[in-house]
């Protein structure tokens, strides 16, 4: 392992010394987006721009912004867009989606979750958000089997950043207060400070969310070639849980019923910090280096009687309330160089981190026998290196290839029962992966681009999968193999001036040992997975943006897919929670500070069990949005689900053949006012 890292750094240093200097214009560091280090120009992605972020951000969980993009759906716990939100790209859940913040890993490294609820009002501190669909082989951190989400924090050296106060209120006692201060760059210094408090009762009974956030980003710009900045994002949130559904009979009696009980709450604090230095070493060589630290502490409560009642019907009362404690920290660093050599662009980089998470159950729980107490620690080590070479033989042609080596290992310490402890070599929890990809673009005319790409990626099982959904190791591993994903994409982009943009993308993803949902949940509340013998996901995605006249716009996207898997028990069936059709449309008018429009969101029915006997119906909403700018004020109003349609974001099947539904809110609104200083 040490030899590999040494060779990588030797190669990077040699590259810096041997490259020929080019007579080029000095690039402005403010314009360098870190995500551009990790991708070629061939992408199947959607970008939320700074203007979009300003217009659509009202404190909602980012998952619900992603759901307006092709092939993406969002789910929620409490029936609203606040609190816990989840998202799936092409039917693949967020543990298969790589998330980075300024190139630094965001996912927690044991179960690969990426919970934006831990960082309330995240979007108020972002410059852009890029969502890439399809397997990616050059991400930092966990494997991006389904795609990647690249968060780019606000540019503190931008003269156009506004300081403002924001206040909103809406249905279910939803409210948000935010203050943002953006200092105009002064003597090389930049500063961004944000403080937010938001609350909602939630649509579900006692499905509340109470969140606070504080973010600071500051840095110094030495000149046009050198910048350094520090970012600290901190969030605290408390929730009434809602991860258990209800039967239709319960929802007919009380549409706002919650499958969880009132005593099942959680408390979390999360802090994400990073220090980043960027420089143009020469006119052709760009370097970025970062160190980062992530910390989270909290617990969630679990009522065993309620769980047994909902999932199994008949049960023996235990009168137990578990309080599962979790505390983790992650420390890491990355280093990237991008070198421009005439028709070639070479990018190389290294990322590594160590992650430790403590799991504990103690006397904060109620009526739990002392012998059930546990305390253990999982430690994850992850080191990866990658190289990407892009070649432009002609102005109209681009080809590129990338390769990544990734080493991952998991160790476990049981502080109560030492016999259950193990290291990475004891149980095969050490993996060496080689991921790679190829891309090609052809632009026959300025308005048209034809592209194709292929990626091959490997992913190891999560801790929860290996432990069978238990919070502590019981001595037996679930027999799961790493999954292998292959993804071929082909598409065409067409642009007609500033009037029309169209993208049509075809994809074929096939897997070996894909870890698919089996419809069951562990005692830790996380869904369980099994290896499929074989599986695939094929589809077409269409994205169109049309400026009908100067002030009237129409955006529409849709996808159609076939998603199959083969298992020993059920044979060939459809994937769970994977709709065959998704569609979104937005018709809006924007003129002289006034914006008004209607948008709609749809996805087809989804199966919730491996036998495909049970499903939840299609989802469709019609929404209204408007805003008006007057001098330093901006007023906005959003009304969701205008038709008051009954929608279910997801469902699960219990052991006695009942579907437990997660019902979304009916017609609801949020209104806001923003004052720019």
Regions found by a protein language model. Name each.
Residues 238-255, 358, 363, 407-422, ...:
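Surface-exposed extracellular loop regions of Gram-negative outer-membrane beta-barrel proteins
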Residues 225-229, 233, 267-419, 432, ...:
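Face-selective signature of the C-terminal outer-membrane beta-barrel domain
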Residues 169-199, 204-240, 265-285, 293, ...:
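Transmembrane beta-barrel wall of Gram-negative outer-membrane proteins
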Residues 458, 511-512, 554, 602-609, ...:
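C-terminal beta-signal and adjacent terminal beta-strands/loops
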């Amino acid at each position: 392992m040490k030899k590999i890292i040494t060779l990588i750094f030797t190669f990077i240093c040699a590259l810096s010394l041997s490259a020929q200097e080019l007579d080029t214009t000095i690039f402005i560091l403010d314009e360098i987006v870190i995500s551009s280090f990790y991708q070629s120009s061939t992408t199947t992605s959607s970008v939320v721009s700074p203007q979009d972020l300003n217009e659509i951000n009202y404190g909602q969980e980012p998952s619900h912004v992603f759901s307006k993009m092709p092939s993406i759906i969002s789910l929620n716990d409490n029936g609203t867009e606040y609190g816990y939100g989840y998202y799936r790209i092409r039917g693949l859940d967020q543990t298969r989606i790589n998330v980075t913040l300024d190139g630094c890993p965001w996912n927690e490294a044991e179960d690969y979750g990426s919970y934006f609820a831990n960082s309330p009002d995240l979007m108020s501190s972002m410059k852009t958000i890029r969502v890439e669909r399809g397997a990616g082989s050059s991400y930092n951190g966990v494997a991006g089997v389904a795609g990647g989400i690249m968060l780019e924090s606000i540019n503190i050296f931008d003269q156009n950043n506004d300081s403002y106060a924001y206040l909103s209120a809406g249905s279910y006692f939803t409210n948000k207060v935010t203050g943002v201060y953006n200092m105009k760059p002064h003597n090389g210094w930049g500063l961004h400070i944000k403080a937010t408090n938001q609350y909602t009762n939630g649509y579900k009974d006692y499905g509340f969310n109470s969140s606070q956030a504080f973010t600071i980003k500051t840095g110094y710009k030495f000149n046009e070639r050198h910048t350094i900045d520090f970012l600290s994002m901190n969030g605290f949130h408390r929730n009434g849980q809602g991860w258990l559904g209800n039967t239709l009979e319960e929802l007919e009696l009380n549409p706002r019923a919650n499958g969880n009980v009132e005593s099942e709450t959680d408390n979390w604090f999360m802090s994400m910090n990073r220090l980043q230095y960027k420089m143009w070493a020469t006119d052709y060589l760009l370097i970025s280096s970062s160190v980062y630290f992530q910390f989270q502490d909290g617990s969630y409560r679990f009522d065993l009687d309620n769980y047994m009642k909902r999932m199994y019907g008949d049960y023996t009362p235990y009168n137990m309330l578990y309080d599962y404690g979790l505390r983790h920290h992650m420390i890491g660093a990355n280093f990237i160089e991008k070198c421009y050599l005439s028709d070639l662009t070479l990018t190389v980089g290294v990322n590594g981190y160590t992650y430790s998470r403590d799991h504990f159950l103690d006397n904060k729980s109620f009526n739990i026998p002392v012998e059930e107490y546990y305390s253990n620690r999982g430690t994850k080590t992850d080191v990866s290196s990658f190289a990407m070479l892009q070649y432009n033989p002609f102005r109209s042609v681009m080809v590129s290839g990338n390769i990544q080596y990734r080493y991952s290992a998991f160790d476990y310490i049981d502080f109560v029962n030492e016999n259950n402890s193990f290291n990475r070599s004891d149980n095969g929890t050490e993996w060496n992966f080689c991921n790679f990809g190829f891309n090609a673009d052809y632009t026959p005319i300025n308005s048209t681009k034809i592209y194709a790409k292929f990626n091959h990626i490997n992913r190891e099982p999560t801790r929860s999968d290996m432990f069978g959904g238990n919070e502590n190791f019981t001595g037996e591993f679930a027999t799961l193999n790493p999954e292998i994903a292959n993804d071929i994409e082909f598409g065409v982009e067409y642009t007609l001036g500033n009037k029309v943009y169209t993208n049509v993308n075809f994809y074929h993803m096939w897997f070996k040992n894909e870890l698919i949902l089996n419809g069951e949940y562990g005692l830790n509340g996380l869904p369980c997975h099994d290896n499929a013998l074989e599986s695939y996901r094929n589809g077409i995605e269409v994205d169109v943006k049309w400026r009908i006249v100067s002030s009237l716009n129409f955006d529409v996207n849709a996808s159609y897919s076939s998603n199959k898997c083969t298992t020993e028990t059920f044979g060939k069936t459809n994937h769970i929670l994977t709709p065959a059709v998704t569609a979104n449309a937005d018709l809006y008018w924007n003129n002289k500070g006034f914006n008004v429009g209607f948008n709609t969101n749809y996805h087809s029915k989804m199966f919730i069990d491996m036998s495909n006997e049970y499903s939840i119906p299609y989802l469709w909403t019609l929404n209204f949005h408007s805003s008006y700018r007057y001098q330093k004020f901006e007023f906005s109003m959003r009304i969701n689900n205008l038709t008051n349609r009954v929608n279910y974001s997801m469902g699960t099947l219990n052991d006695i053949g009942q579907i437990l539904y997660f019902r979304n809110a009916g017609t609801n609104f949020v209104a806001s006012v923003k004052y720019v200083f």
